[in-house]
Amino acid sequence: MLFRSPTAIDLRLILSVIKVSANLERIGDYSKNMAKRTSVLLQMREIDNAASSLRRLAKEVELMLKDALDAYIQRDPERALEVINKDKDVDQMYNGMFRQFLTFMMEDPRNITACMHLHFIAKNIERMGDHVTNLAEIVYYLVKGEIIEHVRPKGDRTSFTVVRPEDSD
């Protein structure tokens, strides 16, 4: 590149490498945080179905990451779009888990500590999915030279969740 003028694709490639590495670093940060929380959870009693729900969520994000990296290597914008579309599924799974953890905490206060750690692990996995979606958007931009013009809605509906304890009357 030093012996010629850089083209648009050259500049997009440089930009994509920088952005991809930043997103992968954040995914690594979330993984580290999850490992710390897991060591605490090992000392607590197991919450019904929580482990299998987390595994399903993590598997979905893992497959998205594989597809996003494959799209990057193969410069495949269609595969990148498929990854972007899967983000909604991850958000829905996370929102369901959030409600599930709230239910477990309300049913038995002894579940609160474990459910909070599980919630943060699920949130970390959901955020990993968001970073994987960023990777897919970067791939699309790299190949097509176009920024995807959709505004990604925040799939996390937990900010609007209201829990009302049952009346004691």
Predicted regions and their residues:
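Cytosolic, long alpha-helical scaffolding segments
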Residues: 1-169
